[in-house]
Amino acid sequence: MKHILDLVDKVYKKENISYEQFIYLIKNGYKMQFYYKKRKFGSTQFDGYEFYEWNKDEGYQSYKTIEEFSDKINIDRKKLKDLWSDVKKIDFAD
């Protein structure tokens, strides 16, 4: 429990978190958002795990498991985990 609270605290303090920590927060029910190249992206959970770009109808991605979500989410066909060092403003979703 303390680990998740430490991560939540890091996000509130606007500290960087790793891709694995980002996925861990999502796995534990947190809706997240971030910016990549001035574009806003978010994640949520309805019927599995969803990833989307804000205010865009295309490009919505949905996966049944957190493992599939973690491995496959992408921006412009590039895996998010490979782009993570360029992600900015990681926060909880609005």
Show where each model-derived region lies.
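Negatively charged, low-complexity tracts enriched in Asp/Glu with abundant Ser/Thr
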Residues: 1-33
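Mixed-charge, Lys/Arg-enriched low-complexity segments
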Residues: 3-11, 64-94
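Acidic, low-complexity, intrinsically disordered interaction modules
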Residues: 27-30, 34-35, 39-74, 81
